[in-house]
Design a protein with these regions (language model features):
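Cytosolic ends of transmembrane helices, especially the final helix of ABC transmembrane type-1 domains
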Residues: 217, 246, 290, 311-347
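Juxtamembrane helix-loop junctions of ABC transporter transmembrane domains
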Residues: 16, 59-63, 97-139, 143, ...
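Conserved catalytic Walker-motif region of ABC-type ATPase nucleotide-binding domains
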Residues: 130, 254, 371-373
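ABC-type nucleotide-binding domain
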Residues: 359-616
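Membrane-integrated ABC transporters
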Residues: 1-56, 75-89, 107-111, 128, ...
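Transmembrane helix-loop-helix hairpins at lipid-water interfaces of multipass membrane proteins
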Residues: 42-106, 180-211, 285-292, 296-305, ...
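Short intracellular "coupling" helices and adjacent cytoplasmic loop segments at the cytosolic face
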Residues: 7-16, 125-156, 218-252, 344-357, ...
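An intracellular "coupling" helix at the cytosolic face of ABC transporter transmembrane type-1 domains
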Residues: 36, 151-161, 213, 217-220, ...
Length: 616
């Protein structure tokens, strides 16, 4: 039994040791991040901290001298001569006061600069991570929880840890100097300070940990309130919410979740408040007991009035400094817990990096693209999406992928774009295995026009230039792409031409229709001038006339490109040189439009259903 108890104690000690090692690791990581962002300002912040650390002692001692010398001068036969000494002390105190306040102003400026630089640095790190991590992370609910904790709760915490650590060091030096002063009065005075402050500090530490655990456990609920807030406030949901009269339901749901969050949060704070009140009673008893002892010693002549003033102020300042130190230590502890989320997020491994290879994407392609026995399932799913799929896309040809939703059409595009790698099989580009070709080279040679393409609230020129944002090829190339996409005339008619901001974000910006945005997306794809053009339901949101006009443009401007087309509209699919029909995770049929109709199989069945719908 004793052996088990000893083992339990050892285990508890081991886990406690591991926890503190983790806190220390988070603490070091905070300094590493802040120093990387603000080297110069981190070093220079030491100077105001040093000034602030010696000022409490200097101020308290100067007040003692001023009081004693003033009392002496009042009873001196040569009052003016005695007052000169008082005046000198007042001037020194004034200089210290001014120096302290100038130091505080300088320190506030340093902190503001460091905060701005650090936030820019952290945002850059987060943006680099979110745009480079493997796209499979976006299929994982745990990623969103981690992102929420890192972005909403942790992004500013490393800076707080560093700022509060500097403040703790500053206040500790100041407290040490006051403690030396108080020990000249009595050895027990310092114990009075501990009795007045330690219980309150322990309360803050305990409830910092409780609050952290509560925030962690309620991350998903908090995320849901943010999502509902987006539904209620963003323009893209506004019409549907009004048409379905969803607002009352969503507002009730938001209030319910917020009430649960608020009550859970306040429950912790109410309990903390109760413990803090008890700790404050203890502090008041200790401090005012010490005041009584000091006053008694002054009455019986042991202390001067100046010493009385000095010790009273020193005790008050000492208690205040102790409370600040414990408060900052509690905050450092809490903030360091959150820093771990930021570290884990920023350290998410990036798999889709360029391999150590010199192999570039063949340019120009001669043979084309071959999917050879490709099988794949998403990392977050147990269901296979593709099984032994074989597809041949000749260079310069347009190939269409047809099938029901979820049949794997878009997955093939993701595999070709190296967002994912096949579980088995190969994707060959002119005979080269895609996995051996540099990722950057693959992305340079593929462009896309998607169903849910982005509407960038930038200028018309920038919207097109984003096709190849890393290279500035001049306005002529932008205009050329716009002309090919037949959007140049519209852009020229806008108030500021190519410098007009698109969308609804500003008062002087201009919104486009869906068809016009689609042409803008086409211009962006043409500006990139890649060999392979992916078109994933590019006309799904267009009416028949707009679709016809857009595909007339497609036929003309993409005639020399290798095009991979996904569409449910057979009027669109007919433009393809060859068609693959996907069903049950594999290729069910393949051939030209005419061949597939003659087979009278799955393709013909889907085509006839759609044709009947249009006839009716």
């Amino acid at each position: 039994m004793q052996l088990k108890e000893a083992e339990k104690i050892n285990n508890n000690m081991y886990f406690a040791y591991k926890k503190w090692r983790m806190r220390l690791k988070n603490f070091r990581y905070s300094f590493k991040l802040v120093y990387a962002a603000t080297k110069f300002y981190t070093w220079i912040s030491i100077f105001p901290a040093l000034i602030g650390s010696v000022m409490p002692f200097a101020t308290v001692y100067l007040i003692k001298l001023i009081v004693d010398e003033t009392i002496y001068a009042a009873g001196s036969p040569d009052k003016m001569l005695a007052f000169k000494k008082v005046l000198l002390l007042i001037i020194i105190a004034g200089i210290c006061f001014l120096l302290n306040h100038l130091s505080n102003v300088f320190d506030a400026y340093i902190k503001d600069v460091r905060e701005q630089k650090f936030f820019d640095y952290i945002f850059n790190r987060i943006h680099e991570k979110t745009t480079k991590i493997d796209i499979e992370n976006f299929d994982d609910d745990k990623y969103y929880d981690l992102f929420s904790r890192a972005f909403e709760n942790a992004q500013s915490r490393p800076l707080y840890v560093v700022n509060q650590t500097i403040t703790v060091v500053q206040n500790s030096i100041a407290l040490l100097s006051l403690a030396v002063l108080l020990l000249t009065l009595h050895n027990a005075v310092f114990l009075v300070l501990l009795l007045a402050t330690v219980p309150l500090g322990l309360v803050k530490l305990k409830f910092s940990k409780a609050l952290y655990k509560w925030v962690r456990d309620n991350t998903r609920k908090t995320r849901k309130t943010w999502y509902i807030n987006d539904l209620l406030t963003r323009e893209e949901f506004s019409m549907e919410i009004r048409l379905f009269v969803l607002s009352d339901y969503l507002i009730r749901l938001f209030k319910k979740l917020r009430t649960e969050i608020r009550e859970g949060y306040l429950k912790i704070y109410k309990k903390r408040m109760l413990f803090e009140v008890l700790a404050q009673f203890m502090a008041a008893f200790a401090v005012f007991g010490a005041f009584g002892v000091i006053s008694y010693n002054t009455v019986i002549g042991v202390l001067t009035v100046g010493s009385l003033t000095m010790y009273l102020i020193a005790i008050e300042r000492g208690v205040s400094l102790f409370n600040l130190i414990f408060k900052d230590l509690s905050n450092i502890y809490a903030d360091s817990l959150y820093v771990e989320y930021l570290e884990v997020f920023l350290d998410i491994p990036i798999k889709e990096k360029d391999r150590e290879t010199n192999q570039k994407f063949p340019n120009p392609m001669h043979k084309g693209i071959v999917f050879k026995d490709v099988s794949f399932k998403y990392p977050s799913s147990k269901r296979s999406v593709l099984q032994n799929v074989n597809i041949n896309i000749e260079a310069g040809k347009t190939v269409a992928l047809v099938g029901a939703n979820g049949s794997g059409k878009t997955t093939l595009i993701k595999l070709l774009s190296k967002f994912y790698a096949p579980d088995s099989g190969k994707i060959l580009i002119d005979g080269q295995d895609l996995k051996d070709i540099q990722l950057s080279s693959v992305r340079e040679n593929i462009t896309a026009l998607l169903q849910n393409f982005a509407h960038y609230n930038f200028t018309a020129a920038e919207n097109i230039k984003f096709g190849k944002a890393g290279k500035d090829e001049g306005i002529e190339k932008i205009i050329d792409a716009a002309k090919k996409a037949q959007i140049d005339g519209l852009i020229q008619s806008l108030p500021y031409g190519y410098d007009t901001v698109l969308g609804k974000i500003y008062n002087d910006s201009e919104e486009l229709s869906i068809g016009q945005w689609q042409k803008m997306g086409l211009a962006r794809a043409l500006y990139k001038d890649s060999q392979i053009v992916i078109m994933d339901e590019p006309t799904a949101a267009l009416d028949a006339q707009a679709e016809y006009e857009l595909f007339s443009i497609f036929k003309e401007v993409l005639k020399d490109k290798t095009v991979l087309l996904i569409s449910h509209r057979f009027s669109t699919v007919q433009m393809a040189d060859y068609i693959y029909v996907l069903d049950n995770e594999s290729i069910a049929e393949q051939g030209t439009h005419k061949d597939l109709l003659k087979k009278n199989g799955l393709y013909a069945k889907m085509y006839n259903k759609q044709a009947l719908y249009y006839q009716q």
